[in-house]
């Protein structure tokens, strides 16, 4: 009997992030929604993380599923996010999705932008 090893996911989603996305999708009353994570130019460090809901999975997108929630990342953004993790935090500074990114060499003080 041979076992097939599962390839590690290129990016992780924490339980907190999956639970928040599930709650937001329920509020929107559209079970087709997926969390799209992307990178754009901007911010004080050069690149910014972006989060939006999308009903589509585009050709070439990487799909990560956790607890019934789907996260999609386009190929261009994925190259900057490999090995990272998407989380959801609540604190004195507010609540937000965050990315732990081992590829970032520097980040800004608020953590919303980074450079490589």
Swiss-Prot record:
One of its GO terms (molecular function) is 2 iron, 2 sulfur cluster binding. Keywords: Iron, Iron-sulfur, Metal-binding. The lineage of its organism: Bacteria, Pseudomonadati, Pseudomonadota, Gammaproteobacteria, Aeromonadales. Binds 1 iron-sulfur cluster per subunit. Required for insertion of 4Fe-4S clusters for at least IspG. Belongs to the HesB/IscA family. This is Iron-sulfur cluster insertion protein ErpA. It comes from Aeromonas salmonicida (strain A449). Its cofactor is iron-sulfur cluster. One of its GO terms (cellular component) is cytosol. Iron-sulfur cluster binds at residues 44, 108, 110. Homodimer. One of its GO terms (biological process) is iron-sulfur cluster assembly. It comes from the Bacteria. InterPro entries: FeS_biogenesis, FeS_cluster_insertion, FeS_cluster_insertion_CS, FeS_cluster_insertion_RrpA, HesB-like_dom_sf.
């Amino acid at each position: 009997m041979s076992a097939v090893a599962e390839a590690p996911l290129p990016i992780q989603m924490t339980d907190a992030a999956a639970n928040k996305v599930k709650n937001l999708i329920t509020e929107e009353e559209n079970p087709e929604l997926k969390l799209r994570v992307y990178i754009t130019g901007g911010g004080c460090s050069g690149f910014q993380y972006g989060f939006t809901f999308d009903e589509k999975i585009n050709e070439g997108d990487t799909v990560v599923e956790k607890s019934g929630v789907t996260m999609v990342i386009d190929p261009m953004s994925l190259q900057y996010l490999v090995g990272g993790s998407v989380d959801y935090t609540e604190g004195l500074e507010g609540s937000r999705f965050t990315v732990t990114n081992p590829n970032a060499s520097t980040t800004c003080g608020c953590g919303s932008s980074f450079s490589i």
